[in-house]
């Protein structure tokens, strides 16, 4: 009998083991779709970004005009630009759901996969930040100025560090040029890390909603989950199409339609919506260095989650108290996102401070205590 080429060919064999004959738990739900959706988002962003880069000019006197030129004069340039801008938003929606799934079902206990995922999140945030600067509108310029200036909070090296990143004494042409270089390069680094992320995942196999070993009940990835993923792809593409075609500026900031002007500060400087939760945590601490450290720790705290897992059960499926705390965390994130977009005045300052304390308390105190208490209740000690 002739051997199947997909199982013997050196390259096709890798594809086969990843996408076709991969043994997958039979009970994984819709929440396991988001990994493949992130892959789709990355492909969309790289392709649209490549076409935008062909027409974009990374120079402060031409950047804003080149974006207008793309939208007006390039064939379907307006569509490519709208897909790229809104694709970033959907990318972050998928990332946050993917992380939430990992937190809820205990997927973080695959430590290597989880830690690479956190590094991927940092790279994604860096890519989105430098990308937001490129159109060189008011919010691009002032967002870049404010966020990079936070590095000056670090003792001794802070000011030198900021000037090194700026390439001068203010956000200027050198800054825009290097940010364009970073924005072009980082997605390829993300792609490489994504391959390693998947590699580590396939060393252990996927987790499942029960949090139990599923070796006795696996099914092949194709056709079962390839079709299930295809449904997710279709849903995402319809959403992205609707957003890019009907409401392309819904998630953007009106200030960015004004060319960058170093002499006029916008009334409210704020980043894109997907950074607002971290921005709210940053603003809730009156001390500059304290705020920067809180901002960093709001993401780095994800690295501590596997170490703070106290429950004898992996998943939250049968842990009611942990479920309550998880949904408080989700609500808290939404509150922080809302606060990040509000002006710095009462009662927003107080709400932001309470939400920030709650955010860290849930990770560091509430969740570990809930796991310990549930062990006691179920006499699993």
UniProtKB/Swiss-Prot annotation:
<dbReference type="GO" id="GO:0006122">
    <property type="term" value="P:mitochondrial electron transport, ubiquinol to cytochrome c"/>
</dbReference>
<dbReference type="GO" id="GO:0046872">
    <property type="term" value="F:metal ion binding"/>
</dbReference>
<dbReference type="InterPro" id="IPR005797">
    <property type="entry name" value="Cyt_b/b6_N"/>
</dbReference>
<dbReference type="InterPro" id="IPR016174">
    <property type="entry name" value="Di-haem_cyt_TM"/>
</dbReference>
<dbReference type="InterPro" id="IPR030689">
    <property type="entry name" value="Cytochrome_b"/>
</dbReference>
<keyword id="KW-0999">Mitochondrion inner membrane</keyword>
<dbReference type="InterPro" id="IPR005798">
    <property type="entry name" value="Cyt_b/b6_C"/>
</dbReference>
<dbReference type="GO" id="GO:0008121">
    <property type="term" value="F:ubiquinol-cytochrome-c reductase activity"/>
</dbReference>
<feature type="transmembrane region" description="Helical">
    <location>
        <begin position="114"/>
        <end position="134"/>
    </location>
</feature>
<keyword id="KW-0679">Respiratory chain</keyword>
<dbReference type="Pfam" id="PF00033">
    <property type="entry name" value="Cytochrome_B"/>
</dbReference>
<keyword id="KW-0408">Iron</keyword>
<keyword id="KW-0812">Transmembrane</keyword>
<feature type="transmembrane region" description="Helical">
    <location>
        <begin position="227"/>
        <end position="247"/>
    </location>
</feature>
<feature type="binding site">
    <location>
        <position position="202"/>
    </location>
    <ligand>
        <name>a ubiquinone</name>
    </ligand>
</feature>
<dbReference type="InterPro" id="IPR048260">
    <property type="entry name" value="Cytochrome_b_C_euk/bac"/>
</dbReference>
<dbReference type="GO" id="GO:0045275">
    <property type="term" value="C:respiratory chain complex III"/>
</dbReference>
<keyword id="KW-0496">Mitochondrion</keyword>
<dbReference type="InterPro" id="IPR036150">
    <property type="entry name" value="Cyt_b/b6_C_sf"/>
</dbReference>
<keyword id="KW-0249">Electron transport</keyword>
<feature type="binding site" description="axial binding residue">
    <location>
        <position position="98"/>
    </location>
    <ligand>
        <name>heme b b566</name>
    </ligand>
</feature>
<dbReference type="InterPro" id="IPR027387">
    <property type="entry name" value="Cytb/b6-like_sf"/>
</dbReference>
<keyword id="KW-0813">Transport</keyword>
<keyword id="KW-0472">Membrane</keyword>
<keyword id="KW-0479">Metal-binding</keyword>
<dbReference type="Pfam" id="PF00032">
    <property type="entry name" value="Cytochrom_B_C"/>
</dbReference>
<feature type="transmembrane region" description="Helical">
    <location>
        <begin position="78"/>
        <end position="99"/>
    </location>
</feature>
<comment type="similarity">
    <text>Belongs to the cytochrome b family.</text>
</comment>
<dbReference type="InterPro" id="IPR048259">
    <property type="entry name" value="Cytochrome_b_N_euk/bac"/>
</dbReference>
<feature type="transmembrane region" description="Helical">
    <location>
        <begin position="348"/>
        <end position="368"/>
    </location>
</feature>
<keyword id="KW-0349">Heme</keyword>
<feature type="transmembrane region" description="Helical">
    <location>
        <begin position="321"/>
        <end position="341"/>
    </location>
</feature>
<keyword id="KW-1133">Transmembrane helix</keyword>
<dbReference type="GO" id="GO:0005743">
    <property type="term" value="C:mitochondrial inner membrane"/>
</dbReference>
<feature type="transmembrane region" description="Helical">
    <location>
        <begin position="179"/>
        <end position="199"/>
    </location>
</feature>
<feature type="binding site" description="axial binding residue">
    <location>
        <position position="84"/>
    </location>
    <ligand>
        <name>heme b b562</name>
    </ligand>
</feature>
<feature type="transmembrane region" description="Helical">
    <location>
        <begin position="289"/>
        <end position="309"/>
    </location>
</feature>
<feature type="transmembrane region" description="Helical">
    <location>
        <begin position="34"/>
        <end position="54"/>
    </location>
</feature>
<keyword id="KW-0830">Ubiquinone</keyword>
<comment type="function">
    <text>Component of the ubiquinol-cytochrome c reductase complex (complex III or cytochrome b-c1 complex) that is part of the mitochondrial respiratory chain. The b-c1 complex mediates electron transfer from ubiquinol to cytochrome c. Contributes to the generation of a proton gradient across the mitochondrial membrane that is then used for ATP synthesis.</text>
</comment>
<protein>
    <recommendedName>
        <fullName>Cytochrome b</fullName>
    </recommendedName>
</protein>
<comment type="subunit">
    <text>The cytochrome bc1 complex contains 3 respiratory subunits (MT-CYB, CYC1 and UQCRFS1), 2 core proteins (UQCRC1 and UQCRC2) and probably 6 low-molecular weight proteins.</text>
</comment>
